[in-house]
Structure formats: structure tokens, C-alpha cells
Amino acid sequence: KALLDAKEANYLLKEYFPFSTFSPYVEIFLKVTGGMQKSGLLEVLKALQLAIGQEENKKNMVRSRKNDREKQEQLSRYIKSLFIASPSLLVIDLDVSYADEWDYNQPLKMLPESTDQKVQTEESVRRGRIEKVQRERNELITQLKKKYKRDLVGYIWKLDYSIEKNFHYNMIYFLDGEKYQNDIEIADSIGKLWTSVTEAKGIYFSKNLHKYNGVGLIKHDEIEKRKSLESNVLYLVKTEYFVKMKLKSESGQKLHTFDRGQIPKRGQSKRSQVYTI
């Protein structure tokens, strides 16, 4: 019964995640069940088993898991490089997004259903909003670099979209912990800067204010705190295995939906001892 009900999720997933692709398993499920709305359970199970066993699908599954592992390893190395560069880091973790009334779907609701005008307007509004979301993120990071200069040791961001949460970013910033300790105030100031950059359309949630694990001041030898931080960061990658944003510019160029700062140069290191986790 649950499997047959899940066939109805085909439409809902595409509606709720219009800019996303899914894990190979979900993609196979959607493709197989998309044309089997009137089929029985046994027919669906046989079709799924056959599809999963196909060589091309097997390769896609292996490739997807490999890419996921490589991303996790890259981020793990990045975090370790930041602690090599700085004896302590002030970790700022924010979710930034847009108020409901600024969801790009709002103007589309005023259009008549099933018209060429709606299709064209949807695409135009979608492209315009994507570019705006990208510009506003770039502007936020640019202003933070100007303010903190080299004390902004690193950062990680990920862009997502769903109907419920609109466009939203997970952002983690790493400041020099020897110079900055007041993480709650700094997180709030970055959130307010986001509101300013978005012309009061943006909202934010501070994980520092709510004292999540893996945020605030973390010294290079505080292994448990570092494990919590790494767990938070790697979670962003793990969720991409199931639902991953894919965006393109008007020219068709692929746009980043996940990025990090540069690995600090060896000459920037402020200490020689390296702690492993």
C-alpha cells in the first residue's frame, strides 16, 4: 500500500523541488512508476527490480556514492587546513533565506492556469530570481571579506530550494578565534547584513544563538568540538546525495550551488602541531 501511495509522490517531488535532481534510487523510482499509475504492486516491484539491475543504473549508483565520498573527504581536509592555519576558530553557522512574500512563486499565482503566458513568465521569473539569489550571496561574502579581511579564515555555503522554505542558504563562516570570541553577536550582525543586502527581504536563523553543537569558539585541540563541527559540515554533503540542486544561467552555464573558500597557504599557518580527528 505504501509503495502504491508513493507513486503519487512523483508529481509532488517535482513540484516541491523544481530545481533539483535526486539520488539514483529515487530517479529510478520516479522514472519507473511515472507511467505505472494504474499498475498493481507486483508489476511495480518487478519493474523496479529490473531497472535497478540494469548496468547503466548500477554505474550511476556507484558514481554517485563515489562523488559523495570525495566531497566529504575534500571538506574534511578543508576544515583540517583551517585549524592548521589558526590555533582556534570562531565558527558562525547561519541559515539565511527569504520571507514568504518574496517567494518567486508568488507572482505566478496571479496568472491563469495552463497558458503560454504562464509558461514564459515562469521561466523568466525563475531565471531572474536565481540570478538575484546568486548576486546577493556574492555581495554578502564580498562585504564580509572587506570587513574581516584575513581574519575571515574560511567559509562554506550551500544553496537549496523547496516550496516550503523558498531559496535558502546554509552558511558557515570561520573567523580567527584569537581575535574574535563573541560568536552570538557576530552571527547576528551577519544575519542583519544579509537582511540589508536583500533590501529587507531576507531572514535568518542563528545556530550560535541557539547554542548548537559545533559552533562558537573551537580550539585546535578540542577534538570533540571539532568532531561536531565536521559532522555539521558533512551533513550538508550527505543530504545532497538524496536531493541536489542543479541550476543554469540564461546562457546555459552551470551555476554553483555549493562552495567553500580557498585552502590557506602553508605560509599562513600560525602553529606547527597538527591534531587529527
Q: What spans do the regions from the language model cover?
A:
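Long, charge-dense tracts
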Residues: 1-22
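Histidine-centered divalent-metal-coordination microenvironment in nucleic-acid enzymes
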Residues: 154-178
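Signature for HUH/AEP ssDNA processing cores
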Residues: 76-156
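Eukaryotic intrinsically disordered, low-complexity regions enriched in serine, threonine, and proline
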Residues: 46-61
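Structured loops at beta-to-helix junctions and adjacent beta-edge loops in soluble globular domains
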Residues: 95-97, 160, 239
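Catalytic "initiation/cleavage/transfer" segments centered on a nucleophilic residue
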Residues: 17, 21-41, 57-85, 109-115, ...
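Charge-rich, solvent-exposed alpha-helical interaction surfaces
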Residues: 2, 12, 25, 44-47, ...
